[in-house]
């Protein structure tokens, strides 16, 4: 997903996506260890998605701290 699409989601949905991506990354690591990973670029993409989500959550957290 693009960052703009992620920003349209609320915090609960972002945390849900984050959990999904973490599970996917965990499974991809196992596939790599067993030699069954076919798309070797996928783990890198999943890590970037996780970073995007964490960045957006942190931005919102800091914005709330400034306001209140």
From Swiss-Prot:
Belongs to the universal ribosomal protein uL29 family. This is Large ribosomal subunit protein uL29. The keyword Ribonucleoprotein applies. GO terms for biological process: translation. Pfam families: Ribosomal_L29. One of its GO terms (cellular component) is cytosolic large ribosomal subunit. NCBIfam families: L29 (TIGR00012). The lineage of its organism: Bacteria, Bacillati, Chloroflexota, Chloroflexia, Chloroflexales. Keywords: Ribonucleoprotein, Ribosomal protein.
